[in-house]
Amino acid sequence: MENKPDWLRVRMPGGAVFDEVTELVRRYELNTVCEEAACPNIGECWNKRHATIMIMGSVCTRACAFCNVKVGVPNALDPDEPERVGAAISKLGLKHVVITSVDRDDLPDGGASHFAKCVREIRKRDSSVTVEILTPDFLGKPCAIDIIASARPDVYNHNLETVPRLYSRVRPRAKYFNSLNLLKEVKDKSPGVFTKSGFMLGLGESKEEVYQVMDDLRCAGVDFIVMGQYLQPTKNNIEVHRYVPPSEFEQYKLMAYAKGFSMVAASPLARSSYHAEDDFRKLKELRFARAKVNE
């Protein structure tokens, strides 16, 4: 594989604010996807006091080929975690929060009720905080979406991760159309919730396959699409097929807008929760503007 190009090089994380966020995460015994997934944007985000909390432990029941999170038999859920999450968010002073999780196929509802408890605990401390959740597919368990919908998240994100043809190699224990159906069900049951999904480029997909995923997501009513470069976290993960240049990401962005997405993030370093607060604000402004036009 070719060497990593310059456009993917980032500064080593550090600084006083970064250290403060690190200390807070440790104090409240929280996991973050920023660390567990070896996100390249951790330095920038943490220096803005933005951290994506990963709930339900640090051990996943899946074994996706792209992911750096540990795989195995997870511990029982920590009943105090929602309270710690709420306290940490309050301490950080965040106005928009992103909560994600490992897959917990061992739980009857896949962890949906734990997500809902975390959302409620955050809002109990500050009802003005907006909450974005990035969930697994819950193995299609029918109760999961209803449980989460009852907590009224502002943004529901579930990532397709890659094109259907590559699922057997990239997400061998997941099904593409299960994920699409989840996103459609969320929108059908909660039309006011912004829905969001992302997938990685550079795994061997073709342009035609990328366009088809866009069409599938639009048919599912998804508002916001995210496309970023896959980066191999360790030598044990699936290799990068190619590094997609920024100009190609720009072409995908233009196509996605042409297909009707309200918001598109497409760049080599784009990630699901990267600039999430700014993007949510833009989505709200766009919805308000459209409502005014239709009055």
From Swiss-Prot:
Binding annotation for [4Fe-4S] cluster 1: 34, 39, 45, 273
InterPro entries per record: Aldolase_TIM (IPR013785), Elp3/MiaA/NifB-like_rSAM (IPR006638), Lipoyl_synth (IPR003698), rSAM (IPR007197)
Residue ranges of domain Radical SAM core in the record: 46-262
This protein's record includes keyword Nucleotide-binding: no
UniProt pathway annotation: Protein modification; protein lipoylation via endogenous pathway; protein N(6)-(lipoyl)lysine from octanoyl-[acyl-carrier-protein]: step 2/2
Family that this chain belongs to: Belongs to the radical SAM superfamily. Lipoyl synthase family.
Protein name (Swiss-Prot/TrEMBL): Lipoyl synthase
Lineage of producing organism: Bacteria, Pseudomonadati, Pseudomonadota, Alphaproteobacteria, Rickettsiales
